[in-house]
Amino acid sequence: LVARYPSIASPLVILARGYSRELPGNTHAEANALAKARTLSPERLSEMFPSAEEETPRGPDIDDVLAHTDVYTTLEPCSVRTSGLAPCADALVAAKVPRCFIGVGEPDDFVQCEGAQKLRAAGCQVVWVKGLEEECLSAARRGRQT
């Protein structure tokens, strides 16, 4: 998750990173990154975004920060979870993430995915990163349990 907060002119800040199965349970990268971002204290957010206090006396709020955050992901955010957990696309929509950069679509042998469509329908700009598809798919398959 890369934040552009409080304004588009502010420097980029890496808010959180995540990878599949990083946190307990059958967790995915986007959900893990969001969960980790939500653990940032108000003090830490103020350190990361000092100019936010000029715009908001209370300092940055994680929901405001996420609404100015770009997501970079190797694999299309899932739209269906066979584990019963919430799909990553739904979590990104709930966080009001405005833009998602995706390295490769989820292959049919994983699950039928409509993550990019869900994001677009919610007003999130989806950017397909060209030229890294094979590397992204290879990374996704390495972590896949068959």
List the predicted regions and their residue ranges.
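Short, surface-exposed amphipathic charged segments that create phosphate/polyanion-binding patches used
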Residues: A116, A139-T146
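Short beta-strand scaffold segments in enzyme catalytic cores
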Residues: L1-S10
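Zn2+-dependent cytidine deaminase-like catalytic core
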Residues: I14-L137
